């Protein structure tokens, strides 16, 4: 019986099929399998021109064959002199040098014989043909001695060095025209799945675009490899086996995309075991658990999970170290920093949990805010400033706890970030884009945790700005009544962002004929709610009380989404019939909108931060007619009071 017809459930527990191997052990097991399978430890060397060597790794030490500079050279424009001839020169007692005692030189000129110093042109005064000097100069002032940069036979670069632009210039100055470097690794990316379609094609229900191959190939190129994507292979074990056999003949690493788990159509592990050696199937990391590591025909094979975040992190953990090893280079190490966690973080025991975070400096302290953690939420990697790894032995971290972050962006860029935590609104997304367009150094990083969560984060010093639209049912006011209750005596400013229309988001044409909140209890109406602590959730609960409706009577009340766009997406996909949200979200998905109320949405900021240079670009943006016009084009917004301080 072919191995791919053997059900995974029949595999013995001590087999490598879908286990929970710690990442470090998985790397060791894969390394042992590569060694036993005859995989090359390092790629062969080749000699390339300097012009083609950027990013390559040296295969031998680079020694200077000439000195640089190859002669004593003038380091400045001016006159070359004998330092001894300038002794005693001062403002009150200048020294005059006759034409035969100096030579005019430009930067880089060989030093004339008998001259050992250069006087800068701007320090030379002329009295007829004589040069008047008002200060003595020491020997070798502004003189570049032979070999100042590098001397003949000096080691310039070691073996295993990844070549940068400055390295190439130094090598050229030291006499090199070519360098011996390791051949660049060749990575083949093999996408699989009946549902996968090439980028640029129209997809129907149950079909997805092959974004993983694009991403993994680009990651390989960033790591110094030559990468190419192979045609998509359907979920057919015989065709997959043939594609794998053909691919390993012409690459140094084969990455098989998807099919790495233990589902009905997941064949990667069994094909690798049939064709070669299966070293590991299942690694104790999240996301990225169903990883396949093996060897086929002396070629390492990595089976990456189909979820994009899992695939990207799998490359970081397993593929990048292998590519560095093949080139004989050390692994690329990202900069690290310490940060305070903005909110509680729960993690499963037994797995290294890779959490994407946004970073910003608040009150002189680096703050990390976790991003959505789903393995399919690729935008969490797009927006991430860093990675927090919660080790397998921990169940998470408490708010305010100090953690170590692996940086994905520079500290300088992060230091300019405006951290906004609180209620979701599309205007903040628009502001983030506008700020970046005006000044690429400025980032507005929003985390959507609801109005209450934002005010708590502001109280705890974990953000610069909290977005809020909390309704106080007792007074009918928004946000202001909550400041004393949540922030205590903290001095804050409240800046009006917009007024916005809240209402029921329904399918086009309102097929159920809903008229308002009271219709949510009708049979067959499925509601999509916002999370606890969200201002929209508070508004819904207030409206339910006003209508005398119990939340238990609403089908879907317990189903929560984190943003207005997520609510609209659920309705658009037919997973719900109605949800309370803003008009702009309904318009974004081409849905109908039933108005319920118009409410203010405000930005709450600590008074100590309100006038800081960091926030100045945001306040300036809110006064911009261009930005206000862009907001109004979204629909359902009023900008008359935008930027006005209301407290």
For every predicted segment, state its role.
Residues 24-27, 41-51, 55-60, 73-74, ...:
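Flexible glycine/proline-rich
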Residues 467-485, 568-597:
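A ligand-binding cleft/hinge motif common to bilobed small-molecule-binding domains
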Residues 430-440, 517-518, 530, 536-559:
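Ligand-binding cleft/hinge of the Venus flytrap
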Residues 415-424, 518-542:
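Short loop->beta-strand "edge-of-pocket" segments that line small-molecule binding or catalytic clefts
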Residues 481-532, 622-628:
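A conserved helix-loop-strand patch within extracytoplasmic ligand-binding domains
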Residues 489-501, 591-620, 641-644:
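Periplasmic-binding protein-like
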